[in-house]
């Protein structure tokens, strides 16, 4: 363990030294001395030295205004560099994830040991489907400018790992590292302006360009190698089990900045970026495919006998087509009215066919080694990314559709749709869906809100088929919510059937999800429309905010289990779409554990999951990390489908019902029923100040004047992560477990922990949260920021946290947290030394900021830096 970490620690230490040198050069020895003193006090404080802790508090409280920003920036930048070193470590020759592709080989060996046939395994590989949905949740706090520099730091660390470097080569790399650290120090880490939805979409395209474009074909090569070695099976060229979708530019739920016009623009921009990236690939193929021998079919396709280099000629034709398409899209993006070229690329087949013809010809002529080079990678990119690059989901809230149809029925004199019973709504919608005449009159002038809903449906109808992946309805509650969207799409003239996915996201809605889908599947028209396929989205973040993490996760499990059984009975292939966040309070969990803790059968229809904010960078920020992350996903899905987890025993279900109810009651007794809670939350966390951070394009609140219930799940989690109480990720869970112990179920809990992946994952997640939470820091925030009348409430919550930690350790039969994942414990310990001063400083800055009549620019800027720094230290924001 120590050996494995010594490489990472030495990289962290080296980057810290370079940062120290940079600070000294920029601001002088006295600032570096101050930073170093604080670091040593923090280290000693963490080791349990009370005198050092007091001195740390005093030192940070007494910083002058001139020292605030440099100190905050020093610790914040150090944590960014630590994250970079850790990310590199995960893919370096010393790290664990370096062996992730090998883990697939171990999985196949284990499956064979369990007497699974090669044919079973091949079938599971053929059915493998991973769709990752990139979302622009405002949790990526680090600026893109800095991310580029950190990626380059990663490259330098990789170069330094070569053993055969000459001195001048090593010196050159070190010089580049010094430059990068200095560039980062002299760059503002906080954005000045909030990104627009188009900026967010461009950030998503940058992830594709800088990482996924290389990472996906590289993963498929690794995967294919493991299949050949273990199963003597080759991945077919057309089989690309990975797709990427995006919510950036399509998710308008609670975000008035995402309009129909924005979605139209992002769709064009996405297609333009695809032509740009494919042009680079084709340019390489034009230069590489200089062979003359080919099949008669290919020669004819290339233009006949007189063509000397048929492959090259075909590639030049594709290049012309891409160039013409790009010019057309560019003109459209500028707002010009232009006629499309005769060879406009709108479908993946147009790209695939000439490339695949070259591939088949090369193989037929004995040039398989050439076929399986760059050409194969490009073919796989066509299958994975294609002409749209990333498909877009459109997401809108259910009441917006209800309001639009109600406005229409009132205009037509049919009554007020909104006030009708659910059965009347369904009857009306099915009647109209079966009708051949349009419902929306040509001359009708609806309100701006309704116009926007109708215009969005028109954008979908006009988009090339395959560029929109699904329409997600947030806060779906009843069958009419789904039928309403189908009617609006029909009225817009949508020529294809788009998957419409209800999103069930509160405790009540999760509990009713199966009933809603049973009703829908009972409608003949609906069954005919969906052609045996249904997508349902399970909301993790809002259900946890509504009921607490334990009750929410059990409701999610039960809902999924019921939906799987209902769809199986009806002969429907169900795709469950998981709306997980990066943090535990929003359903985040290490991918492998999360997937294996789903109900049996939940991954038969493939995996569709959101990848959010800063988690995109941690999992897909580099091609090598992408390979490792995709290997992890593929392995977990194959394992879950071939070795499904056990069905929970009746006794386990009863225990979960008991502790889920108890945990929900405890959670709501604070969050909903305690009249002091909202006041305490606003005082003890930087919730109000978070609104000033220009993070995402989406407002932090659904309603500006509301309480906790109107807060989006992300700022709710973000705020509690900052003050280290981490409340949404544990409140209620320990109380529920204690209730089960009091009911004499301790032995049952121990068995569940050992034999049931769902339960052991929940316990593991709680341990991780507890390891990141910190009682003395949470108490310090109270002392500096909270009115004394509210101190007892803070004390109650901290006492509850301390009690919960004991309960979880007892059930897990461990004497300290994270005993079975020492590398995570190591990572948290490494960061705490640097995160603690940022927390203390943040409390001090919040205190100063709230005392001042007029904002002090220096205090405000330093405060924003501490927020970014703590987020980096915790490795997640919301």
Curated annotation (Swiss-Prot):
Protein name per its UniProtKB record: Phosphoenolpyruvate carboxylase
Source organism of this protein record: Yersinia pseudotuberculosis serotype O:1b (strain IP 31758)
Superkingdom of the source species: Bacteria
Keyword terms: Carbon dioxide fixation, Lyase, Magnesium
Gene3D superfamilies: Phosphoenolpyruvate/pyruvate domain
Class of the enzyme per the UniProt entry, highest EC level: lyase
Active site annotation, chain numbering: 137, 545
PROSITE patterns, per the entry: PEPCASE_1, PEPCASE_2
Cofactors required: Mg(2+)
Residues in coiled coil: none
């Amino acid at each position: 363990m120590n050996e494995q970490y010594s490489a990472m620690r030495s990289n962290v230490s080296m980057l810290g030294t370079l940062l120290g040198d940079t600070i000294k050069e920029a601001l002088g020895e006295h600032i570096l001395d101050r930073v170093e003193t604080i670091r040593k006090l923090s280290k000693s404080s963490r080791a349990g030295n009370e005198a050092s802790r007091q001195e740390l508090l005093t030192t940070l409280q007494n910083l002058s205004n001139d020292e605030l920003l440099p100190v905050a920036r020093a610790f914040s930048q150090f944590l960014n560099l630590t994250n970079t070193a850790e990310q590199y470590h995960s893919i370096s020759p010393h790290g664990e994830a370096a062996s992730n592709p090998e883990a697939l080989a171990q999985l196949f060996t284990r499956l064979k040991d369990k007497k699974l046939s090669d044919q079973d395994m091949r079938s599971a590989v053929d059915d493998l489907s991973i769709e990752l949905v990139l979302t622009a949740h405002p949790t990526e706090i680090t600026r893109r400018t800095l991310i580029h520099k950190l990626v380059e730091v990663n490259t330098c660390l990789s170069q330094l790992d070569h053993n055969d470097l000459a001195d001048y080569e090593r010196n050159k790399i070190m010089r580049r590292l010094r430059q990068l650290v200095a560039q980062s120090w002299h760059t503002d880490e906080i954005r000045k302006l909030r990104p627009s939805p188009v900026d967010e979409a461009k950030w998503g395209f940058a992830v594709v360009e800088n990482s996924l474009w290389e990472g996906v074909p590289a993963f498929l090569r690794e995967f294919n190698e493991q299949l050949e070695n273990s199963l003597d099976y080759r991945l077919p060229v057309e089989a690309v089990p990975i797709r990427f979708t995006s919510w950036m530019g399509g998710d308008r739920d609670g975000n008035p900045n995402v309009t129909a016009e924005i979605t139209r623009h992002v769709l064009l921009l996405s297609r333009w970026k695809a032509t740009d990236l494919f042009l680079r690939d084709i340019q390489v193929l034009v230069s590489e495919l200089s062979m003359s021998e080919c099949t008669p079919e290919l020669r004819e396709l290339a233009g006949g006998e007189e063509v000397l280099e048929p492959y090259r000629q075909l590639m030049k034709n594709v290049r012309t087509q891409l160039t013409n398409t790009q010019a057309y899209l560019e003109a459209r993006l500028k707002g010009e009215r232009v006629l499309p070229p005769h060879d406009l690329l709108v479908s993946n087949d147009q790209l695939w066919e000439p490339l695949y013809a070259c591939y088949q010809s090369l193989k037929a002529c004995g040039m398989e080694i050439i076929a399986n080079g760059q050409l194969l990678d490009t073919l796989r990119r066509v299958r994975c990314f294609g002409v749209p690059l990333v498909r877009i989901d459109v997401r809108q809230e259910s009441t917006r559709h209800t309001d639009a149809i109600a406005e229409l029925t009132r205009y037509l004199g049919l009554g007020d749709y909104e006030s009708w019973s659910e059965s009347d709504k369904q009857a009306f919608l099915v009647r109209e869906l079966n009708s051949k005449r349009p419902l929306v009159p040509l001359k009708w002038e609806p309100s701006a809100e309704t116009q926007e809903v109708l215009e969005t449906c028109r954008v979908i109808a006009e988009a090339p088929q395959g560029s929109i992946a699904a329409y997600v309805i947030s806060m779906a509650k009843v069958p009419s919510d789904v039928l309403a969207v189908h009617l609006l799409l029909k009225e817009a003239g949508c020529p294809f059937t788009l998957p419409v996915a209800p999103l069930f996201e509160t405790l009540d809605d999760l509990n009713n999800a199966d009933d809603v889908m049973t009703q829908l599947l009972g409608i003949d028209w609906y069954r005919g429309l969906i052609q045996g396929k249904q997508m349902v989205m399970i909301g993790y973040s809002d259900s946890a905010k509504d009921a607490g993490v334990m009750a929410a996760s059990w409701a999610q499990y039960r809902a999924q289990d019921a939906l799987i059984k209902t769809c199986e009975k009806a002969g429907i292939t169900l795709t469950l779409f998981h709306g997980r966040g990066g943090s535990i309070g929003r359903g985040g969990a290490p991918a492998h554990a999360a997937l294996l803790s789903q109900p049996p059968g939940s991954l038969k229809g493939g995996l569709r999951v959101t990848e959010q904010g800063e988690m995109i960078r941690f999992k897909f920020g580099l091609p090598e990390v992408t390979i490792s992350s995709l290997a992890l996903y593929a392995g977990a899905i194959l394992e879950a489908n071939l070795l499904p987890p056990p069905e929970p025993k009746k006794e386990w279900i009863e225990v979960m019902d008991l502790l889920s109810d108890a945990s929900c009651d405890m959670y709501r007794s604070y969050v909903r029923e305690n009249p002091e809670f909202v006041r305490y939350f606003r005082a003890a966390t930087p919730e109000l100040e978070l609104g000033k951070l220009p993070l995402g394009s989406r407002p932090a609140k659904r309603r500006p004047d509301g309480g906790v219930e109107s807060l989006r799940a992300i700022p709710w989690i973000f705020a509690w992560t900052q003050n280290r109480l981490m409340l949404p990720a544990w409140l209620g869970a320990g109380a529920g477990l204690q209730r089960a112990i009091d009911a004499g179920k301790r032995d049952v809990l121990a068995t569940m922990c050992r034999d049931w992946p769902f339960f052991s994952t929940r316990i593991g997640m709680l341990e991780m949260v507890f390891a990141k939470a910190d009682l003395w820091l949470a108490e310090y925030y109270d002392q500096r920021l909270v009115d004394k009348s509210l101190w007892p409430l803070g004390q109650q919550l901290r006492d509850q946290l301390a009690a919960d930690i004991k309960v979880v350790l007892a059930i897990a039969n461990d004497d300290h947290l994270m005993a079975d994942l020492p590398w995570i414990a190591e990572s948290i310990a490494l960061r705490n030394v640097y995160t603690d001063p940022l927390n203390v400083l943040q409390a001090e800055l919040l205190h100063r900021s709230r005392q001042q009549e007029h904002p002090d620019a220096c205090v405000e800027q330093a405060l924003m830096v501490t927020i970014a720094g703590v987020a980096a230290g915790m490795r997640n924001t919301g």
